[in-house]
Amino acid sequence: MLRRYLEAWFPIMGSWNVRILFIDGFAGPGEYEGGEDGSPIIAIKSLLEHRARKMISAEVQFILIEKKKDRATHLEALVNELTPLLPSNCKATVLNSAFDHTLTRVLDQRDAQARKDAPCFVMVDPFGVADTPMDVIGRVLRNPKSEVYVSFMYEFLNRFKETPEFEQHLDRLFGTTVWRDGMAIDDQERRKQFFYDLYKNQLRRAGATYVVHFEMYEGQRLVYAIFFGTHSLKGCDRMKQAIWKVAPFGDFAFRGTRSGQLSLDLDASDFGPLRRAMSAEFRGKGWVTIEEVTKFVASDKTDYHTSQIKSSALVPMEDAKEIEVDETTRKRKRKYPDGTKLRFR
């Protein structure tokens, strides 16, 4: 999924900016026990193997942060193997230190170099809840071109929520003490939703315009939740496309978190929730343009992406007479070019 998104992010950001940064805050050793590439190596290879690499004129910096010495050393060895293959405008650096303090220092250096507008993609995939304070995430989101991808370890949080020594970590994680209200909720699903909604709202308060949220399961076991914060409508849509392209894979499956929008399976997808969401949004508003519908679906108000609008939703809706189309705004039946006007019934 990370590779899918970066395949779009690198050429878009790398063509229009002087410098771009990929920051992995909990980079790990660079590979898993089975030999599979970890996120920092995936990121570097996604650039090296990109068919549009020549379009990326920006200076690209990979900043890979790992707190544990042995993991950082192993990662550095893997990065050194790839370094000779990197183009002259790219550099990868491994930093053996803690995420929160190091990211603050990196952003301070960026700002001091008059590169405050340099886009950043910051990946935060911790084990646990410490070292990921909301104020640091907010520092990233102050830049309108920057994005954060956070793995939210709900099961870890749920396990230690009543452990006094973790309270200060949770205060910093959420950037508020309101999380304590969730401790009184007995129902597990309601409690989980409370924490999810709080974290999503805190990301918005920290500066994110859109927050994409999905859960990843292994079988029936929740592994973690993903929160992607961005200022870009296109980025929001691209992330959802990336998630759908890899869902499901092996024993893993993604689930959307909007009401009724749960199973993300490309081979057996249910687009009923998308149809219902569009109807709920636009019914009673008279004629709306295809552009308005596209903007709604691209946003974080649905778990779907814009490539699914026409053939998967509008065509069956038109066949079922759930929408009316102004025929003067198109030339062919069951087609919805720019400027098409629709009325939802």
Question: Language model features by range: what are they?
Answer:
Residues M1:
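Charged catalytic carboxylate motif
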Residues R4-V106, T306-L314:
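SAM cofactor-binding core of SAM-dependent methyltransferases
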Residues A52-I56, C120, P126:
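ATP-dependent adenylation/nucleotidyltransferase module used to activate substrates
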Residues I65-K67, S97, M123-F127, S151-F152:
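Short His-Asn-centered micro-motif
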Residues D111-C120, F127-A320, D326, D338-G339, ...:
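Class I S-adenosyl-L-methionine
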Residues E327-R332:
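Short, Lys/Arg-rich nucleic-acid/phosphate-binding segment
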